[in-house]
């Protein structure tokens, strides 16, 4: 991460910043921008869906729908940003230390409800809120919406990486 806040409009973390935090790469690097971040607690991010997204090539012929499981993965990647930056994000926006070593894993999809299809041209807004920690698992709740319409609610369990 640079020593200066991202120049992108509305970005707390740009796509380049997120790429420095997460081990994911194309085609599974999914978040475009983090627009709000409270390390260790909550965040908001966006993903723009385009007809050129690789996953839409065959999902579904004649009616492109973004796969629901990848919406869940977006929430899991946002959880990795939230917990990876805990204790490492300075007020200047600078990340200190090697955050990638702290990014954990998706352990469980406890509940997922897909409320509306997501299609090319949609901008999906993801919101994540931290929940209780039980042993090595952290509960999180996430929502996704397109405009004012909710498209996903999900409850996950994530882990921190073993030191």
Question: Where do the protein language model's features map onto the residues?
Answer:
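Hydrophobic beta-strand-centered segment that forms part of the acyl-chain substrate-binding groove
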Residues: 3-6, 10-12, 79-125
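Compact, glycine-rich, soluble single-domain proteins
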Residues: 57-84, 90, 106
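Hydrophobic residues on conserved beta-strands that form the core of alpha/beta folds
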Residues: 31-32, 109, 139, 153
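Conserved positions in beta-strands of structured domains
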Residues: 32-35, 110, 115, 129-131
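HotDog/MaoC-like acyl-thioester-processing domains
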Residues: 2-11, 23, 39, 117-163
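Catalytic strand-loop segment that frames the active site of acyl-thioester-processing enzymes
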Residues: 24-66, 70-71
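Beta-strand-rich interaction surfaces with strong enrichment in secreted/lumenal proteins
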Residues: 19, 62, 113-116
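Terminal targeting signals and extreme-terminal segments of soluble enzymes
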Residues: 15-22, 54
């Amino acid at each position: 991460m640079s020593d200066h806040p991202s120049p992108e409009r509305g970005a707390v973390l740009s796509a380049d910043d997120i790429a420095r935090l997460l081990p994911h790469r194309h085609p599974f690097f999914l978040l475009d921008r983090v627009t709000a971040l409270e390390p260790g607690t909550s965040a908001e991010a966006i993903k723009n869906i385009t007809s050129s997204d690789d996953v839409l090539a065959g999902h579904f012929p004649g009616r492109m729908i973004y796969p629901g499981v990848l919406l869940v993965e977006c929430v899991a990647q946002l959880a990795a940003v939230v917990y990876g930056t805990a204790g490492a994000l300075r007020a200047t926006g600078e990340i200190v230390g090697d955050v990638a070593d702290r990014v954990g894993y998706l352990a469980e999809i406890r509940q997922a409800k897909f409320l509306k299809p997501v299609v090319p041209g949609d901008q999906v807004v993801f919101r994540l809120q931290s929940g209780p920690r039980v042993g090595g698992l952290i509960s999180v709740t996430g929502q996704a919406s397109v405009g004012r319409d909710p498209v996903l609610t999900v409850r996950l369990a994530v882990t921190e990486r073993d030191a």
